[in-house]
Amino acid sequence: MKLALIGIGQAGGKVVDALVDYERRTKTGFVVDAIAVNSARADLRGLRTAPESRQVLVGLTRVKGHGVGADNELGAEVIAEDVGEVLSMIDDLPVHEIDAFLVVAGLGGGTGSGGAPVIARELKHIYTEPVYGLGILPARDEGGIYTLNAARSFQTFVREVDNLIVFDNDAWRKTGESLEAGYGSLNAELARRLGVLFSAGEGDGSGAVAESVVDASEIINTLGSGGVSTIGYAAVELDRPKRGLLSRLSGGKAEADDGGDSTNRITSLVRRAALGRLTLPCEISGAERGLVVVAGPSDVLSRRGIERARTWLEDETGTMEIRGGDYPIDSNFVAAVVLLSGVYDVPRVKELQAVAIETQRDMLAKRESSAASLDDLVSTGDDRIEPLF
């Protein structure tokens, strides 16, 4: 699937960095172009893969290149005011080569959470290609204002895109990691999952041909349910001489390849992917649509295993709209990616909304209390001191 990536804000830019880095290392060619949009000049300078010619600094007259300070209403305003600059850069893209746009943003900050829905709305108004969102939820300990930002952005973003893929930082952060290392590893994990999913079917024709091809139409149909999506992933290393692009499929445990266990291996991987750590933890029963992609050497991609895994996922989700296919690549790993679209039983989102409501109430009460306290401070009580004007 050919994508145009648009990273909004600091987190969005760094995730796009990770996706482009993955695509370049694996030479899979699913990224047609990538653009970074931010209100903070320093954040744009920190990007590795987006050259200055593919960067847009917005809000220069309002915030002078210093960012919006986690104010997502201001973030939405500065993006809306300068959206013409963003669209002008997008106009330069070879849109005829693009299957979809992917707008990426952290939902807890200011520029990304406020601006991503604005960009998505404009893209849907102008282009016929699907516009998908990738939203990153803040961790619980990042603070109430970021939770409130995320809750407000979430309900707006999901309305403006054709489908919103969600990644929950809180479910993936490891204890003891530094902030920079933690987010770096999370971005790499997310890029691996999305990379395997979107690069399926994008080979140059020189390798093995998939028996059941997963192309752009399969992904578009799966995401066609709208709403919210989550992605699962599992990988296992084959016990044989290493070869090929090992970095593409990593993180699995070593396992012997006896030639007759391919079916069981694939069904086990798909179960682990669907029932393990999803990008957004949720109850998978009730998902509207699903897609299974199994990647690895062609000689271990059992068609029977993929069909059994697909049938199992139909039973678990309760929907017959489960697509599946293989993705032959030269690797020493076998990996399964499960995309679940239209999920709705998501406790984390309900928790996020509850905390956001409480934060909003506290902020309003504090604002009213502060105004009254200031009046008490400046008042002399008997009104004998006159103000200057």
Curated annotation (Swiss-Prot):
It holds the Pfam family Tubulin. Coiled coil: none annotated. SMART domains: Tubulin. InterPro entries: CetZ (IPR032907), CetZ_C (IPR048737), FtsZ/CetZ (IPR045061), Tubulin/FtsZ-like_C (IPR037103), Tubulin/FtsZ_GTPase_sf (IPR036525), Tubulin_CS (IPR017975), Tubulin_FtsZ_GTPase (IPR003008). GTP binds at residues 10-14, 110-112, 142, 169, 187. Disruption phenotype: Does not affect motility. No differences in growth rate or cell size. GO terms for biological process: cell division; microtubule-based process; regulation of cell shape. CDD domains: CetZ_tubulin-like. Keywords: Cell shape, Cytoplasm, GTP-binding, Nucleotide-binding. It is found in: Cytoplasm. One of its GO terms (molecular function) is GTPase activity. One of its GO terms (cellular component) is cell division site. HAMAP family: CetZ. Belongs to the CetZ family. Involved in cell shape control. This is Tubulin-like protein CetZ3. The lineage of its organism: Archaea, Methanobacteriati, Methanobacteriota, Stenosarchaea group, Halobacteria.
